[in-house]
């Protein structure tokens, strides 16, 4: 089970599937917690915005044609921080084994000016290797080899100024009530509250089954 067994499911759908099993529901809840935390962290390090405007057609690094359409997510190059190398796109902390975070697209206008867009590679609905899920996550290899590549500087890299807004964003991330344990939950909670609820739910189920076992054995 994974976060897809919770995300977007109605109470009935959940209760007829993963919700019927303590093991499956716990797996799904844990994966949802990881999914939400990982995507929230990556979105702070590598913020996206929706592209607004007419369609743009450019080329990718391998020479393929790529069209950027309205509503696609692209890197917010105006507001993102960078690592010690000062390069765009900045490195995400957690990566999917099946795809990079961005596709680099170079678009040349009628005047011959070229602009680079970093188009976010959305999570696949069917290919697990392209999802931020426990079975296909890893710490970014680039950051493992060079930890200073974690985004932490403003793009005015000559001054090596620390991007203070990142600290504020991470503080706010922990405070937000944006996640529900499962479709049966009546309210949203913070990550810490979610974890406490998940452990409490599993502990309660374990206690019930233990009592049933003891009763049957007596």
Per-range role (PLM):
Residues 1-218:
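Structural signature of extracellular appendage/secretion-system components
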């Amino acid at each position: 089970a994974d976060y897809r067994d919770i995300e977007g499911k109605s109470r009935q759908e959940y209760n007829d599937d993963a919700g019927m099993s303590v093991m499956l529901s716990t797996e799904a809840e844990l994966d949802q917690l990881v999914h939400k935390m990982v995507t929230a962290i990556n979105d702070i390090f590598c913020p996206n915005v929706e592209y607004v405007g007419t369609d743009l057609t450019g080329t990718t690094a391998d020479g393929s044609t790529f069209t950027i359409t309205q509503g696609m997510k692209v890197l917010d190059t105006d507001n993102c921080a960078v690592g010690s190398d000062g390069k765009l796109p900045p490195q995400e902390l957690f990566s999917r084994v099946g795809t990079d975070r961005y596709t680099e697209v170079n678009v040349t206008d009628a005047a011959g000016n070229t602009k680079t867009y970093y188009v976010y590679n959305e999570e696949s609905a069917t290919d697990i290797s392209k999802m931020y899920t426990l079975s296909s996550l890893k710490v970014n290899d680039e950051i493992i080899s060079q930890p200073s590549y974690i985004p932490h500087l403003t793009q005015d890299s000559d001054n090596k100024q620390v991007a203070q807004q990142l600290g504020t964003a991470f503080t706010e991330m922990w405070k937000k009530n944006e996640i529900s344990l499962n479709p049966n939950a009546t309210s949203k909670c913070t990550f810490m509250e979610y974890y406490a609820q998940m452990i409490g739910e599993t502990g309660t189920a374990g206690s019930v089954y233990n009592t049933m076992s003891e009763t049957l054995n007596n």
